[in-house]
């Protein structure tokens, strides 16, 4: 039977620089049924330069015309919050991990005993960071996003060179939000086959269709941005799923796993009881005297399933009754002179 994927709620910027909102979000994520909350661990200065020059102004995205440094100021999770959020998640029995964006971020997360690390696709070229994360011997999650085939191969090979083989590769479209027609979910499975790793989905589409479909394709992890409610205006609110949507998605994913069931064809034990009443069997429809021939006029396949299997119908035509057979009774092998 297919195992349900681990479901990760990405908090990202949806705390809106409010620690209480972040904590409230963790409570809601737990209630939604998610397995993990994921943070992003960085400071603006480890991401970019504080420059107003044109190369540092974003073009053609959800954050069009915003300055990179200022965007990361709004979106970052303050480092001083991390210990408190990790402690709260553990009290809630909610898994928690993060994406480090620098060696310093990784050191902080190690001090908090972060159980696994995700490397964002934008960081796939930072082989030094990937190696340091892999050397912790904790599970490594990579995101395809903007990464080329070669970059993914380099990152995976690096993990394996330091004897870290617990690798999950998440199919990701780095568009915010991304379109259903760009999801290309079949490639998620192919990536897993090519690189010999577990695979999953980091989803930026609107709604739960792609996560549910990815589940049916065997995804081991589903990641989706979570926001407490859609009235909040955050850098990530446009492509994040609110509490009600997330809870419904989690339930739909669980139901899809149940619906897939097992590969081995079999009759469901719960339906076997129905067979007794609704499957046909052979019945005597007119009184038959001992020694009288069985014919189309005195036996017939009818419900319920109390007599001989209808597959014997033609075989017994012309054979003789071994005793008096009363109408409206099931026909058994003992009722026929020559036993079947």
Curated annotation (Swiss-Prot):
The entry's keywords: Metal-binding, Transferase
InterPro entries in alphabetical order: AFP_Neu5c_C, AFP_Neu5c_C_sf, Aldolase_TIM, Neu5Ac_N, Nonulosonic_Acid_Synth, Pseudaminic_synth_PseI, SAF
GO biological processes: carbohydrate biosynthetic process; glycosylation
An example Gene Ontology molecular-function term: N-acylneuraminate-9-phosphate synthase activity
Enzyme class (EC, first level): transferase
Entries under PROSITE patterns matching the protein: AFP_LIKE
Cofactor(s) needed by this chain: a divalent metal cation
Function comment: Catalyzes the fifth step in the biosynthesis of pseudaminic acid, a sialic-acid-like sugar that is used to modify flagellin. Catalyzes the condensation of phosphoenolpyruvate with 2,4-diacetamido-2,4,6-trideoxy-beta-l-altropyranose, forming pseudaminic acid.
NCBIfam families cross-referenced by the UniProt entry: PseI
Protein name: Pseudaminic acid synthase
Native source species: Helicobacter pylori (strain ATCC 700392 / 26695)
Record gene name: pseI
């Amino acid at each position: 039977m297919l195992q349900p994927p681990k479901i990760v709620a990405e908090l990202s910027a949806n705390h809106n620089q409010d620690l209480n909102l972040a904590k409230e979000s963790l409570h809601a994520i737990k209630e939604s049924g998610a397995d993990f909350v994921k943070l992003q661990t960085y400071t603006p200065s480890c991401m970019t330069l504080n420059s107003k020059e044109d190369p540092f102004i974003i073009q053609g995205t959800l954050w069009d015309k915003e300055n990179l440094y200022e965007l990361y100021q709004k979106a970052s999770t303050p480092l001083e919050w991390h210990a408190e959020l990790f402690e709260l998640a553990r009290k809630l029995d909610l898994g928690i991990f993060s994406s480090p964006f620098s060696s310093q971020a990784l050191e902080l997360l190690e001090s908090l005993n972060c159980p696994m690390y995700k490397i964002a696709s934008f960081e796939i070229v930072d082989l030094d960071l990937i190696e340091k994360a892999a050397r912790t011997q904790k599970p490594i999650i990579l995101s395809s996003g903007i990464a080329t085939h070669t970059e993914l191969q380099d990152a995976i090979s690096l993990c394996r060179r330091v004897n870290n083989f617990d690798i999950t590769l998440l199919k990701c479209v780095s568009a915010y939000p991304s379109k259903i027609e760009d999801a290309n979910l079949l490639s998620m499975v192919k990536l897993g086959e090519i690189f010999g790793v577990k695979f999953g989905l980091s989803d930026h589409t609107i709604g739960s269709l792609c996560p549910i479909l990815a589940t049916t394709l065997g995804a081991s992890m589903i990641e989706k941005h979570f926001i407490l409610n859609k009235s909040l205006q955050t850098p990530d609110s446009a492509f994040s799923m609110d509490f009600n949507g997330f809870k419904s998605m989690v339930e739909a994913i669980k139901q899809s796993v149940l619906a897939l069931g097992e590969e081995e064809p079999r009759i469901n034990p719960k339906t076997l009881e129905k067979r007794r009443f609704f499957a046909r069997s052979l019945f005597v429809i007119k009184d038959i005297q001992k020694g009288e021939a069985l014919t189309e006029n005195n036996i017939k396949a009818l419900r319920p399933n109390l007599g001989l299997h209808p597959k014997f119908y033609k075989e017994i035509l012309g054979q003789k009754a071994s005793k008096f057979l009363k109408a409206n009774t099931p026909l058994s092998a003992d009722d026929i002179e020559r036993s079947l």
